[in-house]
Structures are given as structure tokens and as C-alpha cells.
Design a protein with these regions (language model features):
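Canonical Rossmann dinucleotide-binding motif of NAD(H)/NADP(H)-dependent dehydrogenases/reductases
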Residues: 11-49
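Conserved glycine-rich Rossmann-like NAD(P)H-binding loop of the short-chain dehydrogenase/reductase
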Residues: 45-60
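Substrate-binding pocket helix/loop in short-chain dehydrogenase/reductase
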Residues: 110-111, 115-123, 217
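Active-site helix of classical SDR
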Residues: 134, 170, 178
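C-terminal substrate-recognition "lid" of short-chain dehydrogenase/reductases
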Residues: 134, 191, 225-254, 259
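Alpha-helical segment proximal to the catalytic Tyr-Lys
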Residues: 139, 183-187, 245
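Residue(s) in the substrate-gating loop at a strand-loop-helix junction
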Residues: 154
Length: 268
């Protein structure tokens, strides 16, 4: 089919498919990583390497997504772990088509009370490991015709929150890192993008949020609800597929509109 000016019309739904491709999901055992693994398989991925530091979690999600799932256990915040993951993943099908990096955690400490250990831990788990993974997988993808990298950032990298300084700084650094990845690796056919979630009601958050906290977070969003892990998985699939074939170096905010909201004391 063509348009009136003879421009070919693509099959848009097929652009969201990732048939036959091999992906690595770092942090696949819980929440957003778990849902992203399902999204990739539903879109046709041949293999999804499910990475977690916990052997039971890795095995569980690999079994859950079916024959495409491959469990991998290790610590990707070390150079040795990142290199081993890249080598093991490449050995499965001879190439890696996409990386989705969802590794990261936050500690709540004020700047005046923060220890060196907490600051270093946040930088390592939210930023430094992304350097290790993107370097290891970038080297592989640059030799095999390209691929996609998707990193989970945070709205904390755009806007500040009390007790969140090290986490926010690491996530802001991650978004800057993604931009440089995009311009350095674009010539190899590698696209790098990030997703910045707002408050997502993951199983981990469900376990700690009170009803009052849930209502407060939902009410703060223009959409009047909290996000779900499927919302983040959908964004990760978009960036991992040809639906975003001409998008690189970008961060997509998925927060229900919170980041767009000026806290003006007027209700409609």
C-alpha cells in the first residue's frame, strides 16, 4: 500500500515486533524487569536472558516466560560480572540484539547524614554498572551490525526529592550517559535510550506503601493514578523495537504527568 503521493505505508504493528531477536534483561527477577521480559517474549523475542543476583528469581522468571527464557545469575555491578554476562549471552545465539538494564535501588538518607558508603553504593548500582554493561555489550553490538540499549532512569534525575540526593544524581548521570552513548555508538547501528519512571506500584512498593501513601501519590499525578510495571515494560519494548527506529539519545518520562505539573495551589 502507498499513500496518495506514492510513499510506501509500512505495517506499523509489525514494527513493534522483535521476532527472532536475542535480548538481555538485567534485573529481570522482579517488578519492571519481570514485566519487560514478558513484553519482549510476547513481541516475538527468540531468547530473553533473565539476569538477577538471586538464583531463584532468575530461574522463576525464565521458566515463567517459557522456552525463550534463559536464567543467568551474577553481579553485573562488577567488571567481571558484566563481561561474563556479555560472553555467556552472545554464546547462546551468536549475537545480542538488545539490552534492557533495570538494575538499581535507592536508599533514603539526608545529605548531612549520608555516609561515603551510601553515596558510593548508589553511584555503583545506578550508574557505574551501566558503564560496564554498555561497554561490554556495545563492543559486541558494534561488531554484529547494531542493536538497542534501554536503561531505566528516574524522574528523580530531573526533579529533586528530600533524602534522594545520591540516587537522583546517579540517575541524572545515567541520562547524560545515554546521550553520549547514542552519539558515539550511532554509527555502529546502536540506539541508546532511557525510560524515567515516576512512582510505579511494583510488588516491592506495594509491600511498603500504606493506603494513605498510595492515595497521595495517585492524587499527585494529573492522571490521578499510580503507574504499573506494564507501563514501563511498554516503554522498554517501544525502544527495543523498530517502532522507535529513528529515536536515540532520548529519555521518555513515564510518570502520569507529574513532571509536567507546576504545583500551583488551584484546583479545577
Amino acid at each position: 500500500m502507498t499513500t496518495g503521493d506514492n510513499t510506501p505505508v509500512p505495517d506499523f504493528l509489525s514494527r513493534l515486533r522483535v521476532d527472532g531477536r536475542t535480548f538481555v534483561v538485567a534485573g529481570a527477577g522482579v517488578g519492571m524487569g519481570r514485566m519487560t521480559s514478558h513484553a519482549l517474549v510476547q513481541a516475538g523475542a527468540k531468547t530473553v536472558v533473565c539476569v538477577d543476583v538471586d538464583a531463584d528469581r532468575a530461574a522463576e522468571i525464565a521458566a515463567e516466560i517459557g522456552p525463550a527464557g534463559v536464567a543467568w545469575v551474577g553481579d553485573v555491578t562488577t567488571r567481571e560480572g558484566a563481561a561474563r554476562l556479555a560472553a555467556d549471552a552472545e554464546a547462546i545465539n551468536g549475537r545480542i540484539d538488545g539490552l534492557v538494564d533495570i538494575v538499581g535501588m535507592a536508599r533514603w538518607e539526608s545529605i548531612l547524614d549520608m555516609t561515603d558508603e551510601t553515596f558510593d553504593w548508589e553511584i555503583d548500582i545506578c550508574l557505574r554498572h551501566a558503564f560496564l554493561l554498555s561497554q561490554a555489550f556495545g563492543r559486541l553490538m558494534s561488531k554484529s551490525g547494531g542493536g538497542t540499549m534501554v536503561f531505566i532512569a528516574s524522574v528523580s534525575g530531573f526533579t529533586a526529592a528530600p533524602m534522594h540526593a545520591a540516587y537522583g544524581a546517579a540517575k541524572a548521570g545515567l541520562m547524560a550517559w545515554v546521550q553520549t552513548l547514542a552519539i558515539e555508538l550511532g554509527g555502529f547501528g546502536i540506539r541508546a535510550n532511557a525510560v524515567a519512571p515516576g512512582t510505579i506500584l511494583s510488588p516491592r512498593m506495594e509491600a511498603v506503601f500504606s493506603d494513605e501513601q498510595r492515595a497521595l501519590n495517585a492524587g499527585n499525578a494529573p492522571l490521578q493514578k499510580m503507574g504499573a510495571t506494564a507501563d514501563i515494560a511498554s516503554a522498554a519494548l517501544f525502544f527495543s523495537s523498530d517502532m522507535s527506529a529513528y529515536v536515540t539519545g532520548r529519555t521518555l518520562v513515564v510518570d502520569g504527568g507529574v513532571d509536567a505539573k507546576f504545583p500551583y495551589p488551584v484546583t479545577l
